[in-house]
Amino acid sequence: MSRYTTIPYLEKINFVERYRALCHKFNNYDTCLDSYEAETYKEVLDEFGLLYEYDKREKFFRSVYALTSGHEFILTLGTLKGRVELFIEIGYEGRYMIPSGRLDTIPEEMGYEFDRKKYNLPKFSSVEDLREILYTLMGIIKDLEQAIVEGAGAET
């Protein structure tokens, strides 16, 4: 197994099914808010203790941090109207691990069937929906971090 692939870690945390379930639950484009809700993003990111920068002009949040295993995580949350767009990049030893990028593209890069028209991006109809989406996504990210740290420890 290549040390520059995220696939075993994503499979370990059941990423594809978790992301599909999230998109299925929050999939009503007709009722999604015509709002960015940047303050809610800030509150949730603060609750998870992430340092981040907000690009008001481009409307995205970015957080860059390192794990104890030496992996660097770059999370970018696009604040689209009524939709949550998360990009993830993971660096290790000066290289980016694959697959990476926008979460809805990762299942196909892993070799799984994933209907992006049906399960594109989670959509929120209320601030409560947005909070639940962000908490679910951060739970996935935290589980991925843990799987990577545990996997890196097993390599030594």
Sequence positions of predicted segments:
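Heme-based O2/NO sensor domains and their adjacent alpha-helical segments
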Residues: I74-L77
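Intrinsically disordered, low-complexity regulatory regions enriched in serine/threonine/proline
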Residues: M1-V16, A21-T40, S63-G70, G82-T156
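Short alpha-helix boundary/capping elements
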Residues: G49-L50, S69-H71
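Surface-exposed charge patches
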Residues: E43
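Short secondary-structure junctions
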Residues: D46-K59
